[in-house]
């Protein structure tokens, strides 16, 4: 996939006003993780007794699983780290939206359901359990910024965010996850704000999508893509290794990356050399998991993806 420095920084007009659509799951999660790295001291309201736990998650585990802890709720204690987490999120969000070019902003958070989980029960199964603070922070953000927050239903926050931003004439996407760069538009990476706002054109976005169709998203979402390299691919394209990772995917697409039709043909050929007669089913499966549409409730279709490609290819 392209790196941030490959994109166009001249399309963005700093003198105009934009609406920033923020895929905020990472922003929220990171604040919850930071808090959970430190000890958590709590004070019981009635007795005044204090107790220190290794982390906030350990405190919640005590309340939910220990026979003594089950007698209490969080409300029975003064828990300073909760306030710290709220303050940290507020400060982080302020740094993101405190830009002269931002007229308004919307925060997108992931809800409880996601169609990808129905298609693939192992979706995100490689992730560690979320820190307990995430739920408290999620509820707080939904209350504190209720006029700004939108929670996704049966999709990722990034699906909701992208579709809304793409249909906003002054929309710009605030993001971290590279999955969102598979569509064309204005982007602002809130972990690299010094880079500024950049534009991804349609060919670059399609190339990013094709890369993901090959290598999936193993480390983050447990989407394996093509997790092996067949003998036929090694012989035809001169690549090695045990599986198609991001570097191999980029190498396989390098000579066709400036032509959408040629990229389609290349992806199809690699799937055919990997899966034989079942190549379409496998491409449909991976595409359904990695594709993020600019249209609400539109999903990946291998037949639509292959439009324009000679059926004999």
Where does each model-flagged region fall?
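Extended two-metal-dependent nuclease catalytic cores across DNA- and RNA-processing enzymes
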Residues: 2-8, 72, 76, 100-102, ...
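Noncatalytic, basic helical substrate-engagement surface that gates or grips nucleic-acid strands
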Residues: 2-168, 174, 185-189, 193-194
């Amino acid at each position: 996939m392209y790196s941030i420095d490959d994109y166009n920084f001249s399309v963005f007009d700093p003198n105009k006003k934009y609406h920033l659509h923020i895929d905020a799951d990472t922003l929220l999660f990171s604040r919850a993780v930071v808090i959970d790295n430190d000890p958590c001291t709590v004070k019981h309201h009635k007795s005044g007794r204090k107790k220190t736990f290794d982390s906030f998650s350990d405190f919640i585990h005590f309340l939910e699983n220990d026979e003594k802890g089950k007698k209490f709720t969080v409300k029975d204690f003064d828990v300073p780290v909760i306030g710290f987490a709220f303050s940290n999120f507020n400060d982080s969000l302020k740094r993101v939206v405190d830009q002269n070019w931002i007229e308004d902003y919307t925060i997108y958070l992931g809800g409880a359901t996601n169609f990808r989980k129905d298609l693939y029960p192992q979706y995100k199964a490689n992730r560690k359990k979320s820190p307990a603070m995430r739920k408290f922070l999620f509820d707080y953000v939904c209350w504190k910024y209720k006029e700004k927050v939108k929670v996704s239903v049966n999709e990722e926050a990034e699906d909701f965010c992208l579709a809304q931003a793409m249909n906003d004439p002054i929309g710009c996407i605030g993001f971290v996850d590279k999955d969102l760069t598979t569509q064309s538009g204005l982007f602002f990476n809130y972990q690299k704000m010094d880079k500024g706002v950049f534009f991804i054109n349609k060919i670059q976005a399609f190339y990013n999508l094709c890369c993901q169709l090959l290598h999936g998203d193993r480390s983050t979402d447990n989407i394996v893509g093509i997790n092996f390299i067949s003998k036929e691919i090694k012989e035809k394209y001169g690549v090695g290794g045990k599986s198609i990772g991001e570097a191999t995917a980029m190498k396989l697409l390098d000579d066709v990356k400036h032509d959408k039709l040629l990229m389609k043909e290349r992806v199809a050929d690699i799937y055919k050399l990997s899966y034989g007669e079942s190549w379409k089913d496998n491409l449909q499966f991976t595409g359904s998991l990695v594709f993020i549409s600019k249209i609400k409730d539109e999903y990946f279709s291998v037949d639509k993806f292959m439009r324009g490609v000679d059926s004999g290819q």
